[in-house]
Amino acid sequence: MHKILLVIFAGVSVWAFSPSALVNDARAQIGVTLRYDPSYSRIDYPMGDVAVEKGVCSDVVVRALRVQRIDLQRLIHEDMRANFAAYPRRWGAKTTDRNIDHRRVLNIATYFTRKGYAVRDEFAAGDIVTWDLGGGLTHIGIVSDRRKGDTPLIIHNIGHGTQEEDILRKFKITGHFRIY
């Protein structure tokens, strides 16, 4: 009996997610990721990344989750490869591209929704939020454990490197996700 249980547990991967660690891992990018750079880059797979001193809003989320051992590059690539029609066609792609798919806000939101991470609760530290900035622009950030009054701050990169700012209600919220 004990040998059977050991075999069963050996095949189960243990995943422990910490919202406070996610916030700290995002905050650690402040002063490191210094500029916004949306240029296309060929990157390693899995666990590929552009140079840490640059990036876009989604890179803040991707990098913080990687410290939690969650590789959105691999997860989104695999889900898109198996379910390509479920993802936005906004970029005219006819197939997946593991260099960029995980860096697109709409793809991240689609993946999180498909996995059941969308919530309607109050915002909590470690939650991930997406916005419509208008003009076809989207944005993503991580809810901080710090507040300005009653409003949680957001850790994000909207053009000047990774910052922690009061922008939660500045733009139209299009998604609210909790992956723990």
Predicted regions and their residues:
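Low-complexity, Gly/Ser/Thr/Pro-rich intrinsically disordered linker/tail segments
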Residues: 150-180
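Sec-dependent N-terminal signal peptides
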Residues: 4-12
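...with weaker cross-activation on analogous glycine-rich loops/strands in unrelated enzymes
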Residues: 23, 81-159
